[in-house]
Each structure stands twice: as structure tokens, then as C-alpha cells.
Amino acid sequence: MMAPGWWKFVTPPAALGAALFPWSRPLSFLCLGTAAFLAFFFRNPPREPPSDPSLAVSPADGRLLGYVMEAGEASDDELSSYLDDPITVSVFMSPLDVHVNRAPLDGRVVEAEILKGRFRPAFRKDSATENNRAVLLFDGDPPFVVRLVSGAVARRIDLYVQEGDEVNKGEPIGMIRFGSRVDLAVPRSSVEELLVRKGDSVKAGETPVIRVKR
């Protein structure tokens, strides 16, 4: 499976590589290699989320950038305007990770906002509130926020959902090109157990990161 819009990026270098093949093998191979990398980047492998409704899964592939950011810190001021006393888990995506982002829980999109900002490296703490980003607020059990943050290279955020959409856990909700970070926030009062720690490798739609109260 491929992410939506993949053909717009893969087709041009693939076609150019095929056209150049009789005239210049090096340029042809360069174009075909670029097409192969882009096809790899836009891959969208199927994911099977755990059936347990109390398990919130990672919204992104990558490594855990931050274990928990306490409410009241500068990086969480924005999330505190959406949720009461949020706990946040942040995932950093490298260019080699799958970049399709997925819903961590079942819910309905009640707010979808694109916020303009800078293009600082995504691993910086201040990138969460100063970079270009998309904030998705979901009405679920519990309510939760997914924040897609662009980086120094990743400057394009595509959302697959809009306000009013119902999503299931593990369903694709967006994509950041090419790399960056995704934050998941839930109210502290709804958290029963944190299941991951800094440096852990996680997969979107599959790896449980938080157990919520039921």
C-alpha cells in the first residue's frame, strides 16, 4: 500500500529515468534511484492495532523523543489549551521511517488546525510550539490531541481527516514530508499507565504507548 498522492512524486523521476536510459545510463539510474527512494518513503504498510480499547497506540513510527512532558512546561502550553493537565508522548521520525500517521484511539475530529511557524529541527524542545504544525483535537474516551510538527527539512503536512470525521484506532490521519515529530496528548486524569520510555522504537497504529482508564 502507498500513501495518498504518492504518484505525484514517484512518477516524474521514474518517467524521466526511463526516457534517459538510451542516452545516459548514469542520469537514468540517478532518476530511477530517486523514484525508488520516494516510493519507499511513501509506503503505507498495513497495521493491526490491539483490540483492547484501553490501549492507546503510537501515532507515528520512530523513536520516543520525550517520555513525558509535564503540564506547565513551555512546550505544553499549547496542548493545555485543548486538554486539562495533559501528559504528552513525542515520537521523532527519521527519513527512513514510515511517515503515515495514525489515530491512537477511536474518536471524532472536533478541531483540525494548521498553525504557521518556523522550520527548526524537530528534536528541539521549542519546535513543538514554534514550527509549522497541525493540531487535531479528538472527542473520544478519553479526549486526546495529536500534533504533527514539521522540521528543518520536513515542511509539508498533509491531513487525511477533517472536522466531523469519525476515526478508528490505527486509521491513517495524516503525513509529514520528510521526517519530523508527532505528539500525542491525553488528560493526566485518564492515564492509568505509561507503557514506553525515551529511546523506545515504536510503530504507528500498533505499539501501545499509554493505557487509559476504563
UniProtKB/Swiss-Prot annotation:
<protein>
    <recommendedName>
        <fullName>Putative archaetidylserine decarboxylase proenzyme</fullName>
        <ecNumber>4.1.1.-</ecNumber>
    </recommendedName>
</protein>
<keyword id="KW-0456">Lyase</keyword>
<dbReference type="GO" id="GO:0008654">
    <property type="term" value="P:phospholipid biosynthetic process"/>
</dbReference>
<feature type="site" description="Cleavage (non-hydrolytic); by autocatalysis">
    <location>
        <begin position="179"/>
        <end position="180"/>
    </location>
</feature>
<keyword id="KW-1003">Cell membrane</keyword>
<keyword id="KW-1208">Phospholipid metabolism</keyword>
<dbReference type="GO" id="GO:0004609">
    <property type="term" value="F:phosphatidylserine decarboxylase activity"/>
</dbReference>
<comment type="function">
    <text>Catalyzes the formation of archaetidylethanolamine (PtdEtn) from archaetidylserine (PtdSer).</text>
</comment>
<keyword id="KW-0670">Pyruvate</keyword>
<comment type="similarity">
    <text>Belongs to the phosphatidylserine decarboxylase family. PSD-A subfamily.</text>
</comment>
<dbReference type="GO" id="GO:0005886">
    <property type="term" value="C:plasma membrane"/>
</dbReference>
<keyword id="KW-0594">Phospholipid biosynthesis</keyword>
<keyword id="KW-0444">Lipid biosynthesis</keyword>
<dbReference type="InterPro" id="IPR003817">
    <property type="entry name" value="PS_Dcarbxylase"/>
</dbReference>
<keyword id="KW-0472">Membrane</keyword>
<keyword id="KW-0210">Decarboxylase</keyword>
<dbReference type="InterPro" id="IPR033175">
    <property type="entry name" value="PSD-A"/>
</dbReference>
<feature type="active site" description="Schiff-base intermediate with substrate; via pyruvic acid">
    <location>
        <position position="180"/>
    </location>
</feature>
<keyword id="KW-0865">Zymogen</keyword>
<feature type="modified residue" description="Pyruvic acid (Ser); by autocatalysis">
    <location>
        <position position="180"/>
    </location>
</feature>
<keyword id="KW-0443">Lipid metabolism</keyword>
<comment type="subunit">
    <text>Heterodimer of a large membrane-associated beta subunit and a small pyruvoyl-containing alpha subunit.</text>
</comment>
<dbReference type="Pfam" id="PF02666">
    <property type="entry name" value="PS_Dcarbxylase"/>
</dbReference>
